[in-house]
Amino acid sequence: IPAYHVLGNHDMDNISNDDFLSTTSNPGDANAKAYYSFTVKGVKCIVLDANYNEDGSHYDCGNFDWTYAMVPNEEIEWLKKELNEGNEDIIVFIHQLLSKSVPACVCVQNASEIRSLFESNSRVKVVFQGHHHEGHYEEINGIHYITIPGMIEGESPENNTYAVVELDKNGRILVDGYRKCPDRILETRK
């Protein structure tokens, strides 16, 4: 079973970005970066990396303030290209939030710019996020933003939160949540 990694701030607590990337492999177009794309069963998946400091440096060995995250210009240009290629439905994965109705400290600084790119492309159906340990759901202009609850809140099994997701043939998003992650059946925009 292939594994895909979405880099988060806790991944950079004690190791460098380069060390993390050298010990993992992501199928698809990783290009030695923590942002990349891949296609599974006719669905394009885009993984974004917002682990950047205000000065543009990447999070590295604890050199960051977890309340600041941004998607840099180079990655935005790559994202524009990815959004314009192909005709598959798109699912996006990112650690920090792109939502609007959550505390600013858990959001990407340039979230509105990223959301507007998604909103201009009807193929973007859902964004899966982390970082906000409580979890969250929000629909913004027809796109679903689902924040999976944190799985680092304790050592007991109920904290091992995850979800199995399916885009069905009718275009619905089926989220089969485990433990603290709620189940959802969501209609997608056309």
Task: Name these PLM-found stretches.
Residues 83-102:
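Short acidic, glycine-rich surface-loop motifs adjacent to enzyme active sites
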Residues 1-81, 85, 113-124, 137-176, ...:
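Extended active-site neighborhood of metal-dependent phosphoesterases/phosphodiesterases
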Residues 106-114:
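Charged helix-capping and loop-helix junction motifs
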Residues 177-183:
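Secondary-structure transition/turn motif
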Residues 8-9, 95, 130-131:
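Active-site glycine-centered loops adjacent to acidic/histidine catalytic or metal-binding residues
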Residues 124-130:
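Metal-dependent active-site segment of extracytoplasmic phospho-/sulfohydrolases and closely related
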